[in-house]
Amino acid sequence: MIRKVAGVFLLMLALAGCGKERMVIPNVPVNFSALLTDPRLLKLSSPGGGVVLTGYGVAGLVIYRTTNGNYVAYDRCSTVNPEKQCAVVLDDPTFTVTDPCSGAKFLLEDGTPVKAPAELSLKKYDVFISGNTLQVRN
């Protein structure tokens, strides 16, 4: 009898562990570097400015200058169904980005979701300033 109860318990435990598996944004090498005077980065000259770049990360990069003057960078790949690699787009004003596939929104200050169905923050990359050069790496 104890074996049957233990068997049922183990089966229930195994089934409870089965659920929708969350997809994650793959880790790919990112190594972007440009002078802050580069025309592509012009909108980063003041806090609240953001730019998008293609050809880096999974779906491109979004780089944002926070209200306190720091720089942050995220992969443009939305965390909602990341297997679709839907690239978020900058909103106007550029405090948020929107996933055009799901309608989810993310705050650029820290990458957190602000509109469903997003539950996970955007994938963040490291940003370094060396002299007049901005570098984004992972």
PLM feature spans:
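Short cysteine/histidine-rich metal-coordination sites, predominantly Zn2+-binding motifs
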Residues: D92-C101, P113-K123
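N-terminal pre-ligand scaffold of iron-sulfur
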Residues: G19-T94, L107-L108, S121-N138
